[in-house]
Every structure is written in structure tokens, then in C-alpha cells.
Amino acid sequence: MKQIFLHTSLAAMALAVTTTGAAPERCDGTVQLTSQSNFQVRQAGTQTFVQFDFTGLHDICLADRSVVTGIVEGHLVQRISANGDFSLTFDEVLSYNGGTLGYRGEGSLTGGNWQSNVMTVGLGTGPLAGIHGQGTFVFTGPASLADVIYYVYTP
């Protein structure tokens, strides 16, 4: 399922590039989680599963090259192994100036190797309509992340 979603997202981004002729533009941003709720922990053998809802702040680059901060609400699920390896998935909706844009991401730490992927989901609304992006993220603290997302802007 993850592979189908990834291929669909890549195809949508490629279509956006082909349609507009625009190359993806790099956007360096941050995410700061400001609250967590509905915190749940479940043990299954040597695996620990943690999930919670969150709110926070997330930078996004607009088509005019301005960087603005939106409010995000989302849900995160994390699996932690006894050896310290873990994986996580999240879905969030960013709200800014009356518009919304969905994001979906996943990351994993295996043997000290961090891999991540984040992408926009859907068409966006209001001032966030027509924004498509894909990139990576890293944790910079317990509730903060840095991301690099390449955006394509379609009319």
C-alpha cells in the first residue's frame, strides 16, 4: 500500500511538473509540535506502539517564494523495537490564511540509519491550492523537526 501511495504521489508531482513546466523549488522549513493529546501506548511482544494526536506550527513556502507558518493538526503512530529501531507514520493538515493542505509522512531508524519521506496529499484549498510537494525530515529535538520539501505550484 505504501508503494502504491508513493508511486501515485510521484506520478502526480511529475504530472504537475509536466503541466506547468516548472521545476520543483526547494523549501527548508521547521515543524514545532505544541501539544499532544489522546496519547496511547500498547505493547506487543518486544514492540511498543505509541500513537497520539498533535497540533503545532509548520513552515511552508508559497508560490511567491515567501515562507509562512501554518497551524497543523494531525495523528502520529510510532513502533519502537527493543533494540532501539523505530518507524513512524503521520497524517496532518496544515491551515494557513483560510486554506488547507494535507501532508503524509513516514520515517524509520534501522541500525542507526534514518530514512524519511513526506509529501503533500490532495489539491489544497484557498492560498494553498495547487501546491504539491515531496521531501524529507529529521528530528532536531523531542518535539521539533526540520524538513526539506521540493514544491511545485500549479494554477
Where are these regions (language model features)?
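Boundary at the C-terminal end of the N-terminal hydrophobic targeting segment
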Residues: 16, 21-24
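Bacterial N-terminal signal peptides
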Residues: 8-16
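Beta-strand-enriched cores of mature, soluble protein domains
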Residues: 23-155
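Bacterial N-terminal signal peptides that target proteins for export
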Residues: 1-9
